[in-house]
UniProtKB/Swiss-Prot annotation:
Region (Disordered) residue spans: 119-186
Database matches in Gene3D superfamilies: Helix-loop-helix DNA-binding domain
Tissues in which the protein is found: Expressed in root epidermal cells.
Cellular localization per UniProt: Nucleus
Organism of origin: Lotus japonicus
Keyword presence, Endoplasmic reticulum: no
Protein name per UniProt: bHLH transcription factor RHL1
Chain positions covered by the region annotation Helix-loop-helix motif: 194-229
Signal peptide residues on this chain, from the entry's feature table: none
GO molecular function: DNA-binding transcription factor activity, RNA polymerase II-specific; protein dimerization activity; RNA polymerase II cis-regulatory region sequence-specific DNA binding
Keyword annotations of the record: DNA-binding, Nucleus, Transcription, Transcription regulation
Function: Transcription factor that regulates the development of root hairs.
Pfam families for this protein: HLH (PF00010)
UniProt note: phenotype after gene disruption: Root-hairless phenotype.
Gene that specifies this protein: RHL1
Length: 386
């Protein structure tokens, strides 16, 4: 080995640099006894050689070879220089280079020659490729985690941008039944129909005696009921302001529009505001018994409890009005007819009307009290009809 290096570098004399090597080796720390027997070149299988102990190992080997055989001093120096050149400059040891055998070729000889020309400069100049730093595995995992996190967080970011300021209010998820569409347009349309059905049901509950199921008939009942309520408000307002004489033309016009103001028959105002003609033959005889029963029941309730009577009339869709107003309406729209209820109900109705004034509550039931002048005595009697 010594002859090989002397042939490659004839100008290199190892014996002339003993002082330099001894000075260089003296700076290397020793972690164990340098006098121990380390002449064996191979490491046992059960002993692990650590890369960070390489300085001490080489120092001990060099001293051992210097003591035992002075002729191998140059070979030890060359071995030391080769190991030093193979080590990274930034103390980061590549585990793959640890098991590589030293190459005593031309590259090693050139490195040794450059070492003696300038030891410090050769370490920094001959191995610039050793100064790169590998990112640790933990950082790479973090970078990958950030990348995957960014991709996973992209859809919520787009959804929040589309939502605008409704982030604080979470929209309830609507589950579609089997066979229903799940696209947003179909869901919105289904919710709209459900809201309409709920509003229609609530509106139907406000109308008394509403028993229609289809929407068209139900809306017709609601329209008629609203018209009747408007008429009642107008009549009561005008009766308070201008008396019964001012109300009679209005009621006559509305009754003629309703088709029930024809002469000859009795006029009964229904719950929808129209005036219906009553036949004096068979229809009057069939409804007389039921009307008499209802009138007696109302009279009994008014004698016992006025509040219960008002609630009963409200359930029938009827109301009470002043006798003077009923007289004006009866005179303008109907002919003279026989009374249908006893006189005590007329007196109670007059008492409830508070001497010609309107109902005490706007929520009072809708009972059209008509009066008729019977005979020559001109006695005012009230007529109740559901």
């Amino acid at each position: 080995m010594n002859n090989h290096h002397q042939q490659l570098n004839p100008q290199f004399d190892p014996t002339s640099h003993d002082d330099f090597l001894e000075q260089m080796l003296s700076t290397l720390p020793s972690f164990w006894d340098p006098n121990s027997d380390l002449s064996a070149e191979t490491t046992p299988d059960n002993v692990a050689a650590f890369p960070f102990d390489e300085h001490s190992t080489l120092n001990s080997k060099f001293r051992n070879h210097q003591i035992t055989s002075p002729t191998t001093k140059a070979a030890a120096a060359l071995m030391l220089q080769q190991h030093l050149l193979q080590m990274p400059a930034n103390d980061v040891v590549d585990p793959t280079n640890f098991f590589k055998s030293p190459n005593p070729g031309g590259e090693a000889s050139a490195s040794v020659q450059a070492l003696y020309n300038g030891f410090t400069g050769s370490l920094n100049g001959t191995q610039p490729q050793q100064h790169f730093q590998h990112p640790p595995q933990g950082n790479s995992n973090q970078i990958q985690g950030q990348n995957f996190g960014a991709t996973n967080q992209a859809p919520p970011a787009s959804g929040s941008a589309g939502g605008g300021g409704n982030q604080g209010q979470a929209k309830p998820r609507v589950r579609a039944r089997r066979g229903q569409a799940t696209d947003p347009h179909s869901i919105a349309e289904r919710l709209r129909r459900e809201r309409i059905a709920e509003r229609m049901k609530a509106l139907q509950e406000l109308v008394p005696n509403a028993n229609k199921t289809d929407k068209a008939s139900m809306l017709d009942e609601i329209i008629d009921y609203v018209k009747f309520l408007q008429l009642q408000v107008k009549v009561l307002s005008m009766s308070r302001l201008g008396g019964a004489a001012a109300v009679a033309p209005l009621v006559a016009d509305i009754s003629s529009e309703g088709g029930g103001g024809g002469g000859g028959g009795d006029c009964v105002t229904n719950g929808a505001g129209g005036v219906l003609p009553r036949s004096t033959t068979t229809a009057a005889s069939t409804t007389n018994d039921s009307l008499t029963m209802t009138e007696h029941q109302v009279a009994k309730l008014m004698e016992e409890d006025m509040g219960s009577a008002m609630q009963y009339l409200q359930g029938k869709g009827l109301c009470l009005m002043p006798i003077s107003l009923a007289t004006a309406i009866s005179t303008a729209t109907c002919h003279t007819r026989s009374p249908l209820i006893p006189n005590n109900l007329a007196n109670l109705a007059a008492a409830a009307a508070s001497n010609g004034e309107g109902p005490s509550s706007p929520n009072m039931s809708v009972l059209t009290v008509q009066s008729a002048v019977a005979g020559n005595d001109s006695t005012v009697k009230d007529v109740s009809k559901p």
